[in-house]
Amino acid sequence: MLKPSEDYYELLDSYKELHKEEGKFRGISLVPLVPTLINVIKENNCKTLLDYGCGKAIPYSKKECKSIGLKKPVQELCNLDSFDLYDPAYPKYNKLSKKKYDIVVCTDVMEHIAEQDIDWVLKDILSHSKKTVFLNISCQPALKHFKEGKFKGQNVHVSVFHGTWWSDKVKNIWNKFKHLKIYMVCVGKDYTHVDCIKKEKV
């Protein structure tokens, strides 16, 4: 069984420190993807959702969602029956349920994970889904850098790879979760790589 590396915990501590700054990791990378997410949820008849790596989860806040351009919070726009939020670096949401959900959403997360931890994190994400997974991954450096700790001075996107690399990585993990349909949107400096990984109809 794959386990978190020392770097995982080092990075987690660094992200916890960055989270203390009010404007950091608000979860707003989800906002431009909401129309796509709504379509994915409708297409797969998803009624329950887990946002894995939700940050401060502003898109789900009834009070704050309008300040980031959403008319309603995500759970209402997507007509969900229930949803849960998880982010190990933010105390309010640092408890991960053992439940399974119709869809697991993971945006702006994987590029923050050290390469040696990518496999077990992906496996954890997929293991919480009954039907569908929606992944959004940045394939370019971020504007933020770590201010302290082992990774001081380094870019917070510690795993920057091409979208095709990510597709191959996810497909390898998906081989043990072939009942799932996985949607991927990987965004590089001058390209967008879109993929849908699913079992082929016979």
Language-model features, listed with the residues they occupy:
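Conserved N-terminal segment of class I S-adenosyl-L-methionine
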Residues: 1-101, 119-122, 128, 139, ...
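A conserved beta-strand element that flanks and buttresses the S-adenosyl-L-methionine
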Residues: 105
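Hydrophobic adenine-recognition pocket in adenosine-nucleotide-binding enzymes
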Residues: 109-112
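Short N-terminal helix/helix-N-cap motif within the alpha/beta-hydrolase-1
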Residues: 114-118
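Short glycine-centered segments of the SAM/dcSAM-binding site in methyltransferase folds
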Residues: 131-134
